[in-house]
Curated annotation (Swiss-Prot):
PROSITE patterns: ZINC_PROTEASE (PS00142). Residues 40-65 are annotated as: Disordered. This is Aminopeptidase N. Residues 66-965 are annotated as: Metalloprotease.
């Protein structure tokens, strides 16, 4: 699954833009927030419980000794196959509810004698069979025991069938159920999505099963290791199209008794996990092609989006990416077709359902007239991510969610390889450094981080499972796999990977199985020699949290490692069998020339002539940041690197010019180097035109903005940045002939975006005038947008920040009319840039109304408002006032809660804010925090670290910016 909370290159820069002109006292307001008018009458999303016969067990009556009161399924039964028929109703019934009806037959084998059948079920209302919620029969000559009673256990989400005698080991049985569920708009399980086609509201039925919501669609053994085959049949309105993981067995046939309905039966799936199931009923249309291996490729979307060719780019890159992965894995694509569909309402970024991949519209659709280059990059990388899963995750699947990083980290790494193959001139692989490596280090430097592989007993509940879908699993997983591939070499890595996939096809694995096959590849060749086994090296990166800071003393050649912590005074309570020491691959250059590779072999320190520098020499480690660690040097070597950057920066690779900035700012945050050293590392940027170093500076200085944009430091800081950015702003003004052309190179395009956003956000008059002029031109002729798609996020934000209600209302109206979600995203984020409190307050209230802000966009809208210095306190008050409602509407397992908490607390740096955060935690213990539980603990830790850092550095930073303005 792609990350659900996506920020494009341009939109990410809005974090710098928001609140630029608002360093004034913020007026506290008492706000009455509009309440959402729930289409389903706020009945929750559960259908009524069965009226007679069975019982419903609540949390207050649980007996923990009973297996149905535990979150993990017993291993007494294993499913073989399912036959599932579902009928979604796309108009509301007399009670105003959208529902679906269904029936299911699950065939399973008894592995150990048991007198109870425990199967997952969530928010389903069952039709009784002879007074029970299910019917049981034996297969062949097997006699099934009689059912004693049935019950629904709400807390653990089970349908429990108690038997009068035991099932026999080795025997096969079938259990039948008939049920009804709500086709809610909650983005989970079998749900409905709505969109407008002109003035007509359209409704479709779609799915999102990962991680624990297949059970909301039909009763099933809903764990990844409980693989089975599936026969899916959909009964649907005859004028709509039905899709599922497999192709239809044949044409749809009329439904008996109602000629307005059709029946579509699909081919049997391969053995697969429940979370990869998908089925959709809609009037969507497609564009299609056939890959060289006869795999049918189709891109589905709203009919107008298809007619406008918004799916063509996705179609054009899908075939090459599928071919790339088939070669990369040395394994053919396992299915006869590859459908991909863009959904108007979707909680995640995308989902790798086998053969029917679902996407947010902004991750699949592209319009060259209104989409930016970063939108295009988003499409190709997300497609590559999801198609990578068709083998790694779908064909071979994790045994349990505690190893989620193996699925998502791997896909997050190879997405860059697949996208690079489809777009070879873009240098996409380099973007992993800012997008993943350094972004995740900010979280992994906290004592509240967690290892990649979390102990299985810590991951049981749906909320705990959802917590695993975090930046550690995705970005740290990708970073350490990239490091592994680098020190093995890509060819050797691919050999081990192919062996792993071929050995465990249609099975479940743990990370240890991958290490074993990579080790076999190492042992079958002679050129690559490792200091220890693959497992011994990698266990230190996967079984303990965090990462090392490598410190080099070039006077003595001493090299040492230490667990890097954002707050060095914090206490690490999670023990590590490796004592937070790593086996570290070290690459280095001396005076720009490569040196031989070196391993720091799990010891705290060592000494080597590689790292000893003469008076005129400088040494730099971690070339192209292929290792997952940061580097510190003695003061003299830092000065030599700074001098090199000022005089002949080309002797340092571009990625390492960015690394010098990232590492030094992180080290300064952790009190390991003076903050002035980090700031001095930005002086060379006045002559730098490359994207990566500037992105490192923009990203690193954003922390300074968050800490100081409510203080007297911010004015001198803006003056410094205005002076630094002016040369690159003028460079791109000239290169693009006064912003009328687009730079040819993708990285130059991103550098141009950075230049304009940094210039405008720090008050460069030429940039502010550019934004105002372009936006006014658009307002004067709304049918013709003169702003290049690459620049729209920046121009929209700055124009709205400079303007008032007229500009805001114009942008809001354009948002309502936007036909492409990429354009809507830009406008929705820019609306948070206003400096008018009442407009921000009104905008916040819109997030509670899904008719104004879609549920999938509510979290990112609130966090955009919180990024604005004026909106931050409003957003925080809003979250505190509405936490219970938000939690009930989105559910404790929503991926959005961690992003929400992170977004509204990023600026916290005072004792008062810490007190408020602690009170928020205490006051909502009864409601809970769901998938945001760890994020809340991390917010508390970050706030404490921020308080200490500001106290220590405020005066020093103020004086530095004054001296360099």
């Amino acid at each position: 699954m792609a990350k659900g909370f996506y920020i494009s290159k341009a939109l990410g820069i809005l974090a710098i833009l928001l609140g630029v002109a608002a360093v004034a006292t913020i007026i506290a307001l008492s706000v009455v927030y509009a309440q959402e008018k729930n289409k389903n009458a706020e009945r929750g999303t559960a259908a009524p419980t069965s009226p007679t016969g069975p019982t419903t067990t609540s949390a207050t009556t649980l007996d923990q000794s009973k297996p149905w009161n535990r979150y993990r399924l017993p291993t007494t039964l294993l499913p073989d196959s399912y036959r599932v028929t579902l009928r979604p109703y796309l108009t509301p019934n007399n009670n105003g509810l959208y529902i679906f009806t269904g029936s299911s037959t699950v065939r399973f084998t008894c592995k150990e004698p048991t007198d109870v059948i425990i199967i997952h079920s969530k928010k389903l209302n069952y039709t009784q069979h002879s007074g029970h919620l299910a019917a049981l029969k034996g297969v062949g000559d097997t006699q099934a025991p009689e059912i004693d009673r049935t019950e629904l256990v709400l807390l653990t989400e089970y349908l429990v069938v108690h038997l009068k005698s035991s099932l026999e080991a080795g025997k096969t049985y079938e259990m039948e159920t008939t049920f009804q569920g709500e086709l809610a708009d909650d983005l989970a399980g079998f749900y409905r999505s709505e969109y407008m086609d002109g003035n007509v509201k359209k409704v479709l039925a779609t799915t999102q099963m990962q991680s624990t919501d297949a059970r909301k669609s039909f009763p099933c053994f809903d764990e990844p290791a409980m693989k089975a085959t599936f026969n899916i049949t959909l009964i649907h309105p005859k004028d709509l199209t039905a899709l599922s993981n497999m192709p239809p067995k044949g044409p749809s046939v009329p439904f008996d008794g109602d000629s307005n309905w059709s029946v579509t039966e699909f081919e049997t799936t391969p053995v697969m996990s429940t979370y990869l199931l998908a089925y959709i009923v809609s009037e969507f249309t497609s564009v299609e092609s056939v890959a060289p291996n006869d795999v049918q490729i189709r891109i589905w979307a709203r009919p107008k989006a298809t007619a406008d060719n918004h799916g063509l780019y996705a179609l054009n890159v899908t075939g090459p990416i599928l071919n790339f992965f088939a070669n990369h894995y040395n394994t053919a694509y396992p299915l006869p077709k590859s459908d991909q569909i863009a959904l108007p309402d979707f909680n995640a970024g995308a989902m790798e359902n086998w053969g029917l991949v679902t996407y947010r519209e902004n991750a699949l659709l592209y319009d060259p007239q209104s989409s930016s280059s970063s939108n295009k990059e988003r499409v190709v990388t997300v497609i590559a991510h999801e198609l990578a899963h068709q083998w790694f995750g779908n064909l071979v699947t994790l045994a349990w969610w505690n190893d989620l990083w193996l699925n998502e980290g791997f896909a997050s790494y190879v997405e860059y390889l697949g996208a690079d193959y489809a777009e070879p001139t873009w240098n996409l692989k380099d973007l992993m450094v800012p997008n993943d490596v350094y972004s995740v280090m900010a979280v992994d430097a906290l004592v509240t981080s967690h290892p990649l592989t979390t102990p299985a007993n810590e991951v049981n509940t749906p909320a705990q499972i959802s917590e695993m879908f975090d930046t550690i699993s995705y970005s740290k997983g990708a970073s350490v796999i990239r490091m592994l591939s680098n020190f093995l070499t890509e060819d050797l890595f691919k050999k081990g990977l192919a062996s792993y996939l071929q050995t465990f096809a249609y099975q479940n694995t743990t990370y240890l199985n991958l290490w074993e096959h990579l080790q076999m590849a190492v042992e079958n060749q002679l050129s690559i020699r490792l200091p220890d086994t693959v497992s011994a090296i990698m266990d230190r990166w996967t079984l303990q949290m965090g990462f090392p800071v490598i410190t080099v003393d070039t006077n003595t050649g001493t090299i040492s490692q230490k667990h890097f912590l954002l707050d060095p005074n914090s206490t690490v309570t999670r023990p590590s069998q490796f004592n937070y020491l790593w086996i570290v691959p070290i690459s280095s250059i001396r005076n720009g020339q490569p040196q031989e590779h070196y391993w720091l072999r799990g010891e705290e320190r060592n000494q080597n002539e590689l790292f000893k520098a003469a008076a005129d020499d400088w040494v730099l480690l971690n070339i192209n940041v292929t290792g997952y660690y940061q580097v510190n040097y003695d003061e003299n070597n830092w000065k030599k690197i700074q001098n090199q950057l000022m005089s002949r920066r080309e002797n340092i690779p571009v990625i390492n010019r960015a690394q010098v900035i990232y590492d030094s700012f992180n080290l300064a945050s952790a009190h390991m180097v003076p903050v002035t050293l980090a700031l001095n590392n930005t002086l060379f940027l006045k002559n730098e035109m490359e994207y990566m170093p500037w992105q490192a500076a923009v990203s690193s200085l954003n922390y300074f903005k968050l800490m100081f944009d409510r203080t007297e430091v911010y004015g001198p800081m803006q003056n410094y940045l205005k002076n630094q950015v002016e040369p690159i702003f003028l460079y791109f003004e000239n290169l693009t002939k006064n912003w009328t052309e687009i730079p040819e190179n993708l990285m130059d395009q991103y550098s141009e975006i950075n230049a304009i956003s940094t210039a405008c956000s720090n008050g460069l008059p030429k940039c502010e005038e550019l934004a105002k002029t372009l936006f006014n031109q658009w307002m004067n002729n709304p049918n013709v947008n003169p702003i290049d798609p690459n620049l729209r996020s920046t121009i929209y934000c700055n124009a709205i920040a400079q303007g008032g209600q007229e500009e805001w209302d114009f942008a809001w109206n354009q948002l309502q009319q936007a036909e492409l979600v990429n354009e809507a995203d830009k406008l929705r984020s820019a609306l948070a840039c206003t400096n008018h409190v009442w407009l921000l307050n009104r905008y916040l209230s819109y997030t509670l109304n899904p008719d104004l802000i879609r549920k999938q966009d509510a979290t990112s809208t609130i966090t955009s408002i919180a990024s604005n210095v004026i909106g931050q306190s409003l957003a925080w008050d809003f979250i505190r006032s509405n936490w219970k409602k938000l939690f009930e509407d989105y559910g404790g397992g929503s991926f959005s809660f961690s992003n929400l908490i992170q977004g509204v607390t990023r600026r916290f740096s005072t004792e008062f804010e810490l007190q408020q955060l602690e009170e928020f935690k205490e006051n909502n213990m009864d409601v809970g925090f769901g998938s945001g539980t760890r994020a809340l603990e991390q917010a508390l830790e970050k706030t404490k670290a921020n308080i200490n850092w500001v106290k220590e550095n405020k005066e020093v930073v103020l004086n530095w910016f004054k001296d360099h303005s």
